[in-house]
Amino acid sequence: MTGMRGLSVFISDVRNCQNKEAERLRVDKELGNIRTCFKNEKVLTPYKKKKYVWKMLYIHMLGYDVDFGHMEAVSLISAPKYPEKQVGYIVTSCLLNENHDFLKLAINTVRNDIIGRNETFQCLALTLVGNIGGRDFAESLAPDVQKLLISSSCRPLVRKKAALCLLRLFRKNPDAVNVDGWADRMAQLLDERDLGVLTSSTSLLVALVSNNHEAYSSCLPKCVKILERLARNQDVPQEYTYYGIPSPWLQVKAMRALQYFPTIEDPSTRKALFEVLQRILMGTDVVKNVNKNNASHAVLFEALSLVMHLDAEKEMMSQCVALLGKFISVREPNIRYLGLENMTRMLMVTDVQDIIKKHQSQIITSLKDPDISIRRRALDLLYGMCDVSNAKDIVEELLQYLSTAEFSMREELSLKAAILAEKFAPDLSWYVDVILQLIDKAGDFVSDDIWFRVVQFVTNNEDLQPYAASKAREYMDKIAIHETMVKVSAYILGEYGHLLARQPGCSASELFSILHEKLPTVSTPTIPILLSTYAKLLMHAQPPDPELQKKVWAVFKKYESCIDVEIQQRAVEYFELSKKGPAFMDVLAEMPKFPERQSSLIKKAENVEDTADQSAIKLRAQQQPSNAIVLADPQPVNGAPPPLKVPILSGSTDPESVARSLSHPNGTLSNIDPQTPSPDLLSDLLGPLAIEAPPGAVSYEQHGPVGAEGVPDEIDGSAIVPVEEQTNTVELIGNIAERFHALCLKDSGVLYEDPHIQIGIKAEWRGHHGRLVLFMGNKNTSPLTSVQALILPPAHLRLDLSPVPDTIPPRAQVQSPLEVMNIRPSRDVAVLDFSYKFGTNVVSAKLRIPATLNKFLQPLQLTSEEFFPQWRAISGPPLKLQEVVRGVRPLALPEMANLFNSFHVTICPGLDPNPNNLVASTTFYSETTGAMLCLARIETDPADRTQLRLTVGSGDPTLTFELKEFIKEQLITIPMGSRALVPAAGPAPSPAVQPPSPAALADDPGAMLAGLL
């Protein structure tokens, strides 16, 4: 930019502007001048073009949109001289992104610079690609960049940039780096003596092993040697020593790469690595220099992560915990934070919790730290390390801290205290005390789920009921109590207040008086609960109390004209019921026991924001036997729970619905009787009128379909888990069958998802060949192990699935390409037998791969001159088949045309003289048939849309039959998954036509492809 007077003047003018408006006017004026000059190419010299492009970059840096001149910037890249080429590369990398169309024009020029002999030009090109290179660059330039990286004639500066450039290209297109042969070259790069090249190569290695660690197993001992070299400070230049620490960046990268490999089996390599880790653990201390502290602790905490990954001996684990205990007591807040965070991660390791408990007092002290982020980490750590032995101490500390905690933390704090009290309660009375204290101290932050839960425990444990009623009576004596306390106390006293009748101040009349004092202070949603309690107290008054009856009736009559419909209805109905005598007692009988169910509080805690390493807590919960309170005398989940009101459970009793439920949709899973979520019975307290019925009078539909022996057959929404390894079941996210049917119509999307993993698919189809990529993403901060994926192919497909890594690292995604070759026509599909292990929980599922018959169809629109000669050329059966199809889902002709187009059978409009008919054409590709033309005619009856005549013809009899059956399956309402998952050889028989079911139509979002299998 030296000597560019116009550029200097423009920058000075902008800086001298007095306000934003003046600056904008000056910029607009300059943009207009640049636009005019670019239009007149005859006077646009290379110098002027360079100057104007610099001005555009400066304007862009000021925050203004520059939507022209991009071509001029790109054209400078091809300039023969360095000054112009430098400007072109810099401005292009700043103004354009990887998806810009102009960038494609520069690919050849960039490639010429990369393969050229000018190292300066090579550096410019590699820098551009490393910053904004996309998929197109990856496909075109990856081999050339690889050659530069392994070239012995290139200077280290170029090779460093080549490594980082290749890293960018790999991230944009993992297929750009071919594993075959490159793994050995990668291992050779790790022998590099130049630390700059070695650091860049290690960054590349981290990305490569995260995608496929097995292919790069030869790099594992090389990473250990790098750590040995750095730990001994051998051959480390001064410029790579940071505050006395040999290349901390390279140490961190090498240890991170090692965490993607399984446990090291070679004894000598393992011994050498542990010696290095021991040296790091022993040699790190807190010093006053901030920069040295940051570097040394970055290395240390990465070493701790590696120690946990390697499942080191207990002695080293104890040393790690002791070191972290030292860090959480230092004055530097950043180190305290990292110490607490890593100690929380240590909870994932077995046999370490008892060692962490030794630092419990210091962790509790961190709850009072001025820094809120440290307090949050301390809360997470206390929550994770709690068990039966220390639950009382930790919960009491949390209750004390609740009074002084920030409002932003109180909801999370109360939720975790409630969960710990429930899971590790030594006795139920202590649990009731804790929950009532929570409500008393932080009522605004206690969700309804918490007091619903305590009511369930009290209801299900008769021995607890008198104690809970007496505690509720004590809290009602307080002058000011929270409304949530009024709710829970009113409910408990209404149900069990009569158990205190012999105690002073606990008669029905006295309980009514003390509760009625709170009525003016509560909001509208609480009044219905109080009205229900008044009715219960009136019923339990023995002998009948005329004075109490008079007071209660007065309240009911007062609210008979309430504007709130719920309150009005309760008041009217309770008033009338209270006149019925014995019938009143039958209707308001004592609440029966609730069914046993999994606590919703734990699931809610997992969704709390800003918590560290919830996965550690979940993993430990899976590895240890549960200490949670068990509800007394539980009822079956799918049985008849005794609610406050009679809910209508979703279900269908018609035979077709049952058949559809019994069929196996995508992701068919074994019957392990999962905990089916049941309706929240207590939430009905705040909903419509809650009138109890005797347990025997309430009938319920079962949640799932009924098997042959009348047992609920829960086959959907859970996962195959071997009984000996199962600790709990996973709850699927989304409907797997719907996901599969959606992928039958599109080429990318999610195939399967649960709380731990998401499996997505992206596909490309060309003729009889398909290329799919399975994306498996670990959603947790803990690795998924024992990952296995096996393809069960049908006879008509040839499939080749790339190996899936045994371990998916935390928060990482791995990809596994799948090549599909269609040999002959068939409607059978391949099945992916997928399994993984999270902690000790093994999850397995069989997932249908959306490589369906329609994927090998290519849309083809024919004119009448092309269609009818081909149609007449196809003789009768078996090349041309005709069938009257009944039980068709009634569709208008445009809807039917859209349905056909969606699976690549193209409607040819205007060819059939009858406007109620459709004709269609498509091309089918397979290895045996080649490109085969397929024709179809659909004759509909306007008077009866539930039947039609379907004619399909092609040059191959098997193709004709399979395509006819495929189209018929799309038109008929067939229970999903009625075909077998494992395909049988030979053509499948025609499915039986079934009449349409309104329930099926309403419940089947994937109706277009219903019954594809």
From Swiss-Prot:
It is a peripheral membrane protein. The gene is ALPHAC-AD. The keyword Signal does not apply. InterPro entries: Adaptor_Complx_Large_Subunit, AP2_complex_asu, ARM-like, ARM-type_fold, Clathrin/coatomer_adapt-like_N, Clathrin_a-adaptin_app_sub_C, Clathrin_a/b/g-adaptin_app_Ig, Clathrin_app_Ig-like_sf. Residues 652-676 are annotated as: Disordered. Adaptor protein complex 2 (AP-2) is a heterotetramer composed of two large adaptins (alpha-type and beta-type subunits), a medium adaptin (mu-type subunit) and a small adaptin (sigma-type subunit). Interacts with AP180. Pfam families: Adaptin_N, Alpha_adaptin_C, Alpha_adaptinC2. Coiled coil: none annotated. This is AP-2 complex subunit alpha-2. Gene3D superfamilies: 2.60.40.1230, Leucine-rich Repeat Variant, TATA-Binding Protein. Residues 760-1013 are annotated as: Required for AP180 binding. Residues 663-675 have a biased composition (Polar residues). Its main location: membrane. One of its GO terms (biological process) is clathrin-dependent endocytosis. Belongs to the adaptor complexes large subunit family. Keywords: Coated pit, Endocytosis, Lipid-binding, Membrane, Protein transport, Repeat, Transport. One of its GO terms (cellular component) is AP-2 adaptor complex. GO terms for molecular function: clathrin adaptor activity; lipid binding. SUPFAM superfamilies: ARM repeat (SSF48371), Clathrin adaptor appendage domain (SSF49348), Subdomain of clathrin and coatomer appendage domain (SSF55711). HEAT repeats lie at residues 254-289, 354-391, 393-430, 521-565.
